[in-house]
Amino acid sequence: GTADIVIADLPCSGLGVLGKKTDLKYKASPEGIESLVGLQRKILSCVKDFVKPCGVLLYSTCTVNPAENIENVHWFLKEYPEFYLDDIREKLCPELRDSVEEKGCIQLLPGIHQSDGFFIARLKRKPD
């Protein structure tokens, strides 16, 4: 890969934006989420190739569903050991540092962060 950073803001169930799109709660189904997880993994498997050694892959969704968020990150790290979670705590404003769940991941939640629900993971490619 040749990119310093790749941002993968992927299609998701949108469960983090229910306050704005209330119809989503009636459309969400286990089958639909399973299909989205498969699509997210396919996209991640493709875009990782664009990240150069020591480059960053930012994975983000607008959902609070663990299957689409942290579980995808764990899957990705297992499948692609050339990547690791890069600590983001010091890159965040002080108000968000306590929201870091795992070293390189943050889950923003409605009602806590005055925002919609978002998930962001910072995955870094190891040097060659």
Positions of predicted regions on the chain:
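C-terminal catalytic and target-recognition region of SAM-dependent MTase-like enzymes
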Residues: 2-7, 11, 50-128
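Mobile active-site "lid"/loop adjacent to the S-adenosyl-L-methionine
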Residues: 3, 9-46, 63-68
